[in-house]
Regions:
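Contiguous, glycine/small-aliphatic-enriched amphipathic segments in soluble metabolic enzymes
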Residues: 1-137, 180-264, 268-274, 278-283, ...
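A generic local secondary-structure boundary/capping motif
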Residues: 65, 142, 150-153, 194-195
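Glycine/threonine-rich beta-strand-loop-alpha-helix active-site module
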Residues: 129-151
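Ligand-binding beta-strand-loop-alpha-helix segment within the catalytic cores
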Residues: 154-183
C-alpha cells in the first residue's frame, strides 16, 4: 500500500476533524497507509470532539513508520507548532503552522519516504498574515519542488477539468490566454490522463468567449491563440479536440464524450464541477515530481470545531492519491 502524508491544514479550521473522520472510514483503512503531518494537540481535541476510539502514534523518522500500525491507530509526525490556536478564525499562528506541515510533507515526498501527499485546507489570509506571499497551496508546492510548468486540475463525479489560468482576476484572463500557455496546459492534461491510468483519453478544450468566439464575432482569442495551440498539440500526438463553446462542452463531458476538459479560467471549470460533485470534488496538481491531492473546499471556519464537517472530499482526495502514478 502507498504511504501518504496527510497535512493537517489550518488547525483553526476543519482540517483536524475531516482528517480523523476520513482515516477511520472503511474506504480508507484498506486503500493506503496514511501518516498525518500536523500537531498532536488539535488532533487529540478533534478525536475527543468526535467521541472516537482512536489512538495517535507519534513517529519522527522514516524508520519508525516502516512498521504498519494495528487497529484504530493513526500515525502522526508531531510538528509541535500549534498547541494553542484560536479556533474558527484566520491567525498568523495557524498560517505559519499550516506552511510548516506542507514543507515537511513535501520534503518527505521528495526524499521518497512517502508516495504522495494529501493537503487539508489552508487559509490564504492566514498564511499571508504569517508573512508568506503564496496565493495558495498549488503555487507553494510548485516552488518547494522547483516546478516551473504545473496546472491545477479537479476531479468530481464524471467530470475532470484542468485550468489554463488559476487564481487570476477575470479582467486579466484574456491577456493571459496565449498559444504557448494553452499548449503547455494540453501537455499537462495528457500527463494527467497518464497519471489516472487512461490508455486512450479524449481531451476537449473549452473556448474563452461565448460560442467559442463565433468566428471572431464575440472575441478572437480562439482564432489567434487557442486554435493554433490545438493544432500544435495534435501535431505532438495529444488527443485533443476543440475549442468548443463553453456552454456545451461540459454537457458532452458529463455524458462521457470526453475524459478531460481544458478550461481557460477558474470559474469556467469549477462551476460545472461543483454543480455535480460539490461534496466530493478533489484538487490535484499536475506537473509536480510528487503526487499531491487536496479536498476541493476551504477551511470552513464558520463550522469548524462543531463536529459537523463533511469528510467526503477528503476521503475522495486520499483515494485518488492512492491510485495516481507519476
Amino acid at each position: 500500500m502507498k504511504k501518504l502524508a496527510i497535512t493537517m491544514g489550518d488547525p483553526a479550521g476543519i482540517g483536524p476533524e475531516i482528517i480523523i473522520k476520513a482515516l477511520v472510514h472503511a474506504k480508507i483503512r484498506g486503500s493506503c497507509r496514511p501518516i498525518i503531518v500536523g500537531d498532536r494537540t488539535p488532533l487529540e481535541e478533534a478525536i475527543a470532539l468526535l467521541k472516537l476510539s482512536v489512538q495517535l502514534r507519534v513517529v519522527q523518522s522514516p524508520e519508525e513508520y516502516r512498521a504498519a500500525p494495528k487497529g484504530r491507530t493513526i500515525e502522526l509526525i508531531d510538528m509541535g507548532v500549534a498547541k494553542k490556536i484560536r479556533k474558527g478564525k484566520p491567525t498568523a499562528e495557524g498560517g505559519k503552522a499550516s506552511v510548516h506541515y506542507i514543507q515537511k510533507a513535501v520534503e518527505l515526498a521528495l526524499d521518497k519516504h512517502v508516495d504522495g501527499i494529501v493537503t487539508a485546507p489552508i487559509s490564504k489570509e492566514a498564511i499571508h498574515m504569517a508573512g508568506f506571499k503564496w496565493p495558495g497551496h498549488t503555487e507553494m508546492i510548485s516552488e518547494l519542488t522547483h516546478t516551473r510548468d504545473y496546472a491545477m486540475m479537479f476531479v468530481g463525479g464524471p467530470l475532470r477539468i484542468i485550468l489554463v489560468t488559476i487564481h487570476t482576476p477575470l479582467k486579466k484572463v484574456p491577456s493571459l490566454i496565449s498559444k504557448d500557455r494553452v499548449v503547455k496546459t494540453l501537455r499537462l492534461a495528457k500527463k494527467a490522463c497518464e497519471m489516472l491510468g487512461m490508455k486512450s483519453p479524449k481531451i476537449a478544450v473549452a473556448g474563452l468567449n461565448p460560442h467559442a468566439g463565433e468566428a471572431g464575432l464575440f472575441g478572437d482569442e480562439e482564432i489567434r491563440e487557442i486554435n493554433p495551440a490545438v493544432r500544435e498539440a495534435l501535431g505532438e500526438g495529444i488527443p485533443v479536440a476543440g475549442p468548443f463553446p463553453p456552454d456545451v462542452i461540459f454537457h458532452k463531458a458529463y455524458r462521457g464524450e470526453f475524459d478531460l476538459v481544458v478550461c481557460m479560467y477558474h470559474d469556467q471549470g469549477l462551476i460545472p464541477l461543483k454543480m455535480v460533485a460539490f461534496d466530493k470534488g478533489v484538487n490535484m496538481t499536475v506537473g509536480l515530481p510528487i503526487i499531491r491531492t487536496s479536498p476541493d473546499h476551504g477551511t470552513a471556519y464558520d463550522i469548524a470545531w462543531e463536529g459537523i464537517a463533511n469528510p467526503a472530499s477528503m476521503i475522495e482526495a486520499i483515494k485518488l492519491a492512492a491510485k495516481l502514478r507519476i
